[in-house]
Structure formats: structure tokens, C-alpha cells
Amino acid sequence: MESLKRPPAITTALCRGRDVSYPEIYEVLQGNALFMLQRCDSDGAVLEALAVNAKPGDKLVIPPQYGHATVNIGDEPLVFADLVATACSNTYGQIAQNHGMCSYVLKKDNGFEIVQNPAYG
């Protein structure tokens, strides 16, 4: 599994008088997953985009302020666990407005291809 650099924490919620941001933790239980992550500025410009391939047993921490999607890139069903704080709220308005993440994952005969979503310019 590829490693991710931890970005600086960005406040997303308040908890017990302290500023707290919330990551998510995923574990792949079965199948082969491609986690697509993106972080955008307040105007919607993509600051960072990552693709992380994970197999059974791999764990991935999604940093706060990253939009993410999980794609099954294998031939068997994909099963994963997601640990997230109940106080966490996700906002995917920009992703819906742009018809997906900044990159699409397309199936090919011998795997997959990642292509840019033209809605992000």
C-alpha cells in the first residue's frame, strides 16, 4: 500500500471546547480497492489528488478535509470497514456539482485507467 503524507490539520468541528478535525480509517477485508482522495481549496481548485491501491488487510487513514471515493478494481466483491466519528459530517456538494471526483477510474481489459474529470478544468 502506498503511504500518504499527513497534511496540516484543518478545523472541521468543535468538541469539548477544542478545535478537532476528523479522519476516517478504512480496512480492506476482501477484494482490491482503489481509494481516490482529493483536497480542494475554498474555491474548489484541487490542491492534491491521490490514488491508493489497497488489498485485504491494508488499512488507510483518510485525512480530514479530503474528499474520497472507493473503487473496486478487482474481479471479486469488495468488502471494507470504515471507522468514522459520529460527529463527523461529510460535504460532497462540489463533487456532486462536478459529476464526480477530479479523476475517473475507467475499467480496461488488463486493469484500469485514471483520467481527469473535465469539469475540474
How should these model regions be labeled?
Residues 1-54, 71-121:
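Active-site region of the double-stranded beta-helix
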Residues 34, 58-60, 64-69:
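Histidine-centered metal-chelating micro-motifs
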